Amino acid sequence: MSKKTERQLSSAATQRAAFSFTRRTLLRTAAATAALAAGPAFIKRGFASSGEVNVYAWSDYVWPEQIKSFEKATGIKVNLSKYGSNDEVLTKLKASKGKGFDIIFPSVDTGPTWYQSGDLLQPIDESKVNVDMILPTLWKKSKKLGGVFRRKRYLVPHDWGTEAMIYDSSQRDYKYGTLSYSDLWSEENKGLVTVRQKSSFMGIGLYLDRIGEVPSNRMLDTYKDEASMRAVWDKLLVFAIEHKKWVRQFWNNTQDTLNAFYQNNAVIGQCWDGPSLRMMKETDGKLRYLMPVEGGLGWLDTMAIPSGAANVENAYAFINHLLTPKMGGIFANNSGYNSAVVGANEYLESDSKKVFAEAYPEDAIDRLWWWAPQPAWWSAARAQYVDKLNAA
């Protein structure tokens, strides 16, 4: 990749423009295209009607109901493998040179890292994807967030979500508008916190920028170049190491998060919305998920076809199966994340709608901080800071 292209992908301007994503925009685009969902769900004709498809997905992304209905409709067997992080799937596909799987689910901001890591993904043939079933806002904005490279699309929106604050409301009384990432590091929460190392740096950075202690233009300056990033992250590392004793358990996947609260008695954490909203439902609101004053961390996950996929047509068939309202609803109700499919909200259960409204009150969606496209140098540097925190 040329230096110019890399700068374009990682610039602060790209991050600011990429997601003018608000509650109003989401509702408006969903309503404007909901009529598309009224017709029968379908899988585009012309795909193979037998064989298999090898799916490599996040642990809580593909559900038995989705697999069963797909296999019944197509005769194609789904072989599902699961991973827990973007680093895990990238490492595996690097080692196999893009072979072994037909569909993966990368976060859109990791697109630049994929493109700079070799020929690991193949361009998407948009004529084979039911693009009309994807919320137009997400389809359009995913282009600027990392889904398109050199005028070719590689990443198809699947879902969006957040990483923000979850806490035990029987022991803490936080409110929207005052809850902050800084509450993780209050004296009363010492030894009771769960965070993911690499994203905890972002929460710390947004907090320290807000109070003027470590100015970073809401962390956007860290995407300009490596020197600018390290100037900020060096200071964040000092804070993180000084407060490492506050952490009861680090998490890296959904199961880790569930264990932190259900088994290891964490009281507060910075966690994904999926497991957090699931726990919110399962505990009748005892565990609560809420956006901090600095803004929750917004992300968009996608579907991609590796360069060495053996069952490409079956991969497109499975992608289109997931891009139906009913399948989007099944995903959202089970995972706690938000489907990118037009009409999926019509299949949301009442408790899913309830916890969503409580997690994102007032202007919470408008205030989200969206992960910017991550060039390879940024991801590599972040990994170094995580290693230093782990070793401290």
Model-derived segments and spans:
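N-terminal secretory signal peptides
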Residues: 1-21, 34
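N-terminal twin-arginine translocation
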Residues: 19-25, 36-51
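Mature extracytoplasmic/periplasmic domains
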Residues: 47, 301, 306-367
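Early extracytoplasmic/lumenal segment of secretory-pathway proteins
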Residues: 47-114
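Extracytoplasmic ligand-binding site segments that recognize negatively charged/polar headgroups
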Residues: 108-111, 116-248, 252-256
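A ligand-binding cleft/hinge motif common to bilobed small-molecule-binding domains
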Residues: 110-113, 270-285
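Periplasmic-binding protein-like
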Residues: 234, 238-243, 273, 283-304
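Conserved C-terminal helix/tail region of periplasmic/extracytoplasmic solute-binding proteins
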Residues: 259, 362-392
